[in-house]
A protein has these predicted regions:
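Collagenous Gly-X-Y triple-helix signature in extracellular proteins
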Residues: 1-144
Length: 144
């Protein structure tokens, strides 16, 4: 499937409630994981306040998707994101089709203050975000 103005390619991970979960086949940028909160935020709150979430759902979404394509995207998780990072659970469910040549962020959840990432061997790990830069591999949920 090709979506977006620069023809990013996507891998189908699974069907989910009448929609299809896709992961971008490549890293589209690299960032540190930062939040707007002072101190350490954990899990869901860290994602809600993160610079990566803001970038994906503003600059990335508007640059790479037409209005028609945006209308096909289903809002995901309690933050209503149209573009997001996979959670550790979503990654675990599709790990056999996910290429891990570089490190890339996963979406934090739960109560850990250390966001997860995928290492070059394909393992999901955690470390404190402010010190490291990892790749961004967007995920989308598309209405069938």
């Amino acid at each position: 499937m090709e979506l977006g103005s620069i023809k990013l390619t996507w891998t189908i991970l699974r069907e989910l409630n009448g929609a299809t979960l896709y992961l971008c086949n490549r890293i589209v940028g690299k960032m540190q994981f930062e939040t707007k909160l002072s101190g350490l935020a954990s899990g869901d709150e860290a994602w809600k306040q993160s610079n990566i979430r803001e970038w994906l759902n503003d600059e990335f979404l508007n640059k790479h998707f037409t209005d028609e394509e945006k209308n096909r995207l289903v809002k995901h998780n309690d933050t209503g994101d149209k573009v997001f990072l996979l959670s550790s659970e979503e990654y675990g469910n599709g790990g056999d089709v996910i290429n891990a040549k570089e490190t890339w962020w996963l979406r934090p959840s739960g109560d850990s203050a250390a966001p997860p990432f995928v290492d070059t061997l394909g393992y999901a790990k955690r470390h404190y975000a402010g010190y490291f830069t990892h790749g961004i591999r967007p995920a989308i949920l598309v209405r069938d």
